[in-house]
A protein has these predicted regions:
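Nucleic-acid endonuclease domains
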Residues: 1-68, 73-162
Length: 162
């Protein structure tokens, strides 16, 4: 896991990028997540280079310097991510044409974020556990998280990170 300091310049750019995105049909966050996603894209690009393409592709958000296609999945958090926290791909998003899923978290005040790690798409689904909307995470280390939508999940501790 890599912690990243978020600058005001990154926040301003993310807010602009988010303002250009139409309302999302299946948003669990009333499109607040669009801001978090834009900030996550920038955080990854500023840390590892590559190119953000989320504005032109539904299937992936970032092209790495080695030309791999990454779909970035982001969550807002009010605490530093723990190894047992879930990294999720919603059931309706499983057809995206990416090489990897990359997971990030953004602290609620936008002061910092974390690149949690990544998995190849097929490896993600080999390791993932499926939960239905309303299911409670059975992991005894957690706080009985209730899943807001049907999704596939791995734990942070299962991810690869540079």
């Amino acid at each position: 896991m890599i912690e990243v300091e978020i600058t005001q310049e990154m926040i301003d750019e993310a807010l602009f990028r988010a303002s250009q995105v139409p309302a999302l049909k299946n948003s669990d966050t009333n499109n607040h997540g669009t801001k978090i996603a834009a900030l996550s894209d920038l955080m990854v690009q500023k840390t590892w280079g590559g190119r953000i393409v989320s504005d032109i592709s539904y299937d992936f958000d970032w092209i790495s310097p080695k030309y791999y296609l990454f779909e970035i999945k982001s969550k807002e958090r009010n605490v530093e991510p723990k190894p047992w926290y879930n990294c999720s791909v919603k059931e309706y998003n499983t057809q995206q044409k990416c090489d990897y899923y990359l997971f990030t978290s953004i602290y609620g005040d936008y002061s910092r974020g974390w690149i949690l790690g990544y998995l190849k798409k097929d490896e993600f689904f080999d390791k993932a556990v499926f939960f239905n909307k309303g299911d409670v995470d059975p992991d005894p280390r957690g706080d009985k998280y209730v899943f807001p939508s049907n999704c596939f999940n791995v734990k942070v501790e299962q991810l690869n990170c540079k």
